[in-house]
Amino acid sequence: HMADLPLNHQLTSRGAEFIEATESAAKYRLYALAGGPPMRPGMVRVNEDGRAIKLEIWRMPAAAFASFVELIPSPLGIGTVETASGKRIPGFICEQAGLIGATDITEFGGWRSFLASKAASSV
């Protein structure tokens, strides 16, 4: 749902506005989930070996939130994400069950970096 990626229209068509690009607290792991298309990231909070993950903060009108959440397929959902600044905000999280067949891509530090590496390797 990040800006300029395939599912971003699900935010913008509901009047969501981009607030800022930032990072999570260094308490998460990032995975490329099995299945698709589209390819989907899954971010999971961990007790150790976590890392800061690049993310975007968007503001959506409350009246549009329910229709947006209905579009989110399992194992993804909306939960509480801690930012690098310590704020706790609603954001995408992934259930542990979604990690079956997933690839740990935490080393890339974010979904865009992972996508860029895939594009570069396919050239």
Residue ranges and their predicted role:
Residues 1-123:
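Glycine-aromatic micro-motifs
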